[in-house]
């Protein structure tokens, strides 16, 4: 269940003039060490004061600090505590360029924005009378001037001031202070101890009610969980709260990943445009994915809530603590987190048969939504090479196929090997922005495997088709399986190369029993399922001691996102449906 994000995104025009290429990525010339934000909330004229500490990088190509900005009214700039003067900065469409930042420098920028008239619902906007933010992927530049790119990670301190009828003022991290000002307005101060990219910033102001629960984490710390909702929806958050508790415990037990904040919040509102968003410590959801009335909600409603709550919480480590270097790496956080969500939902079902049904449901989504995308004119790899608008990247390929690519690591290395690789990835890149190659290398090195060919899954589009041929030699008692992979070609693109494809198979005898599998060259059988690695255009495997006419069971567990071209008869398919242990 990952449609919640992209379903409500306004798809960008394909006539945009600027194309961004992955190959053109360059590291930023300046990092932002910290940012202090101050908001004076007024519906049509909110004033935002931003104090950033800019740190030039040793390998920089320019001393100019380039800040992004969209639909902002610039009020003032101070550089190193002094009012700026002409020549110190330039304004260009969508950019504020501050010259000669050669050393660690504090820069204060005051802007004004109009949340009431922000109809793009990107940045800070008003829904009914509530203030809400949506900053993924490039919404923060509609709040203040800032290098709005995911490889800029800064620590945030946020002060919110609002009229007295706004009692709930929320932002990322931990609440430091709150109260009433001398002029009667309310205020709150929040500090996030962890550096994060600007797309994970969040602010919510309004009048809500909160369901609260405290949980004890595996290290003995106590954390406060809060689900905030509009007063009319009070009493409909219990299932969401228990789903959050389960997600926290599951991530502790399955991957050893603890909740890292003293407080974790979810805000549910009827008018949130993105469906659900993983802002660090302050997730914002459309009410559809939080609220459930047991008298009218369906089983699917409850399943969706559990999945989406889990998905956004799991981003805390795979997306927040380790984020993506650039938007070409979107599947690094989304594919990985969809996979984690799928595993969580399956584990919550308990028994193996229920897990199998969940796996079938996930594959059905892939086959019905992503396979057609891979077969059509909009086919693209899970890590595209170019884009006109990042909003066009929120696709079933990036999400669902990306999750299947992540799942193949677990298929190759098992649950223990996958956990080992994931924790190595997090240990290496915690607090930084990473790439798909970084994840692959962590998996490869943790499991002592060469995955250089596996990297093609990130760069080649299309669904591989595998032709299947079988031959049984009754006299020699051998069974030979031949697989041929055919990958889609695209005009103007290099010819596709053979992929590394894990293919899990079994063989059934004429009574429907699994046959012990013994490959040529092996001294004895080893189990009744075998993971074969198809990494050439054509490969064959021969199994010994197959004394009865066999029937192949291929693609067990849906071990790879491929299409098998087989010659099963209807009777053989019915036989597999009755007897296959998978």
Language-model features: where?
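Intrinsic-disorder/low-complexity, polar/charged segments enriched in Ser/Thr/Lys/Arg/Asp/Glu/Gln
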Residues: 34-36, 45-51, 62-64, 95, ...
């Amino acid at each position: 269940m990952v449609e919640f994000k992209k379903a409500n995104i306004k798809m960008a025009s394909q006539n945009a003039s600027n194309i961004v290429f992955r190959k053109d990525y360059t590291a930023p010339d300046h990092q932002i060490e910290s940012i202090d934000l101050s908001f004076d909330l007024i519906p049509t004229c909110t004033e935002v004061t931003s104090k950033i500490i800019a740190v030039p990088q040793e390998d920089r190509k320019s001393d100019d600090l380039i800040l992004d900005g969209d639909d902002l009214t610039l009020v003032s700039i101070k550089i190193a505590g002094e009012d700026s003067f002409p020549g110190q900065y330039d304004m260009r469409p969508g950019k504020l360029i501050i010259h000669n930042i050669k050393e660690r420098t504090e820069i204060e920028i005051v802007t004004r924005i109009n949340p009431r008239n922000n109809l793009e619902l990107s940045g800070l906007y008003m829904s009914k009378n509530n203030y809400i933010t949506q900053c993924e992927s490039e919404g923060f530049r509609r709040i203040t001037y800032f290098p709005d790119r995911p490889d800029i990670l800064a620590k945030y301190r946020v002060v919110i001031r609002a009229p007295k009828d706004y009692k709930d003022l929320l932002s990322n991290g931990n609440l430091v202070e709150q109260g009433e000002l001398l002029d009667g307005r309310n205020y709150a101060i929040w500090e996030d101890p962890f550096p994060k990219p600007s797309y994970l910033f969040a602010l919510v102001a309004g009048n809500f009610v909160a369901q609260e629960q405290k949980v004890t984490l595996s290290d003995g710390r106590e954390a406060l969980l809060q689900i905030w909702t509009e007063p009319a929806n009070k009493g409909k958050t219990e299932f969401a709260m228990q789903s959050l508790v389960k997600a926290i415990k599951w991530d502790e037990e399955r991957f050893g990943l603890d909740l890292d904040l003293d407080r974790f919040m979810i805000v549910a509102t009827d008018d949130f445009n993105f469906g659900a968003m993983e802002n660090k410590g302050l997730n914002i959801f459309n009410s559809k994915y939080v609220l459930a009335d047991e008298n009218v909600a369906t089983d699917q409603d409850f399943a969706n809530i559990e999945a989406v709550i889990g998905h956004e919480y799991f981003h805390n480590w795979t997306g927040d603590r380790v984020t993506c270097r650039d938007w070409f790496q979107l599947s690094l956080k989304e594919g990985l987190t969809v996979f984690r969500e799928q595993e969580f939902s399956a584990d919550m079902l308990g028994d193996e048969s229920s897990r199998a049904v969940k796996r079938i449901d996930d594959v059905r989504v892939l086959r019905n939504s992503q396979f057609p995308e891979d077969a059509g004119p909009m086919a693209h790899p899970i890590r595209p090479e170019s884009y006109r608008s990042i909003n066009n990247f929120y696709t079933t390929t990036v999400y669902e196929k990306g999750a299947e690519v992540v799942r193949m690591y677990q298929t190759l290395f098992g649950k223990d090997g996958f956990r080992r690789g994931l924790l190595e990835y997090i240990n290496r890149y915690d607090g930084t922005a990473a790439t798909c190659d970084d994840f692959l290398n962590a998996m490869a090195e943790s499991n002592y495997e060469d995955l250089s060919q596996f990297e093609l899954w990130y760069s080649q589009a299309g669904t591989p088709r595998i032709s299947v041929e079988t031959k049984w030699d009754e006299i020699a008692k051998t069974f030979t399986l031949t697989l041929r992979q055919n990958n889609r070609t695209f005009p103007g693109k290099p010819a596709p190369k053979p992929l590394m494809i894990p293919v899990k198979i079994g063989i059934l005898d004429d009574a429907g029993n699994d046959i012990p599998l013994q490959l040529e060259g092996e001294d004895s059988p080893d189990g009744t399922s075998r993971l074969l690695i198809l990494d050439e255009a054509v490969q064959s495997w021969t199994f010994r001691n197959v004394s009865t006419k066999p029937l192949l069971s291929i693609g067990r567990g849906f071990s790879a996102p491929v299409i098998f071209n087989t010659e099963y008869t209807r009777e053989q398919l019915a036989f597999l449906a009755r007897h296959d242990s998978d």
